[in-house]
Amino acid sequence: MRIILLGAPGAGKGTQAKIIEQKYNIAHISTGDMIRETIKSGLVLGQELKKVLDAGELVSDEFIIKIVKDRISKNDCNNGFLLDGVPRTIPQAQELDKLGVNIDYIVEVDVADNLLIERITGRRIHPASGRTYHTKFNPPKVADKDDVTGEPLITRTDDNGDTVKQRLSVYHAQTAKLIDFYRNFSSTNTKIPKYIKINGDQAVEKVSQDIFDQLNKR
């Protein structure tokens, strides 16, 4: 099973991706995670990527396709994979097609912008472990402190209000066009891929079940 997970920043793609990965025993390929690892490396490329993300812009198609191509060639992708964060542009989608990356399902997690802004700006992260909190929806026991270690929580530099609005603007201007691209592709291609739209403004478990229901009946 090969799945592309679409949705704006903060729509819950990462959470659902991990659940789908475990449910269907497929590899979760998150370009966001791979980019953050590159940034943590301290290399020149990582520094350049950080500047791009801090400005609320998208990483180049060339870089994204390169890391995805390398990743899907690994053995753990033989049973299938889920792409989280790619493609974000039509050129990326076209490049994946040229590489012969056949997709079975496109799942869009749909959430309104005002809710996305609230979700993202309230996020707090424990850098060492990656544990994630939210000031409203999942607050730590002590404000701005990790529940396990008591260490300070941080806000990602790209999670501030202005940057979030810019990211959503970029999403709607570029990434959202993929919805139409794949919807049209699905309507004219009887084989693959199949387009599925899911209401993301629900409990995590309900979103997951809606996704499973759609995948299992096709």
From Swiss-Prot:
Pathway: Purine metabolism; AMP biosynthesis via salvage pathway; AMP from ADP: step 1/1. ATP binds at residues 10-15, 123, 132-133, 202. Its main location: cytoplasm. One of its GO terms (molecular function) is ATP binding. GO terms for cellular component: cytoplasm. Pfam families: ADK, ADK_lid. It is found in: Cytoplasm. The keyword Transport does not apply. Residues 30-59 are annotated as: NMP. One of its GO terms (biological process) is AMP salvage. Its EC number is 2.7.4.3. The keyword Transmembrane does not apply. It is an enzyme of class 2 (transferase). Disulfide bonds: none annotated. It comes from the Bacteria. AMP binds at residues 31, 36, 57-59, 92, 156, 167. It catalyses: AMP + ATP = 2 ADP. Keywords: ATP-binding, Cytoplasm, Kinase, Nucleotide biosynthesis, Nucleotide-binding, Transferase. InterPro entries: Adenyl_kin_sub, Adenylat/UMP-CMP_kin, Adenylate_kinase_lid-dom, P-loop_NTPase. Coiled coil: none annotated. Belongs to the adenylate kinase family. Monomer. Consists of three domains, a large central CORE domain and two small peripheral domains, NMPbind and LID, which undergo movements during catalysis. The LID domain closes over the site of phosphoryl transfer upon ATP binding. Assembling and dissambling the active center during each catalytic cycle provides an effective means to prevent ATP hydrolysis. This is Adenylate kinase. The gene is adk.
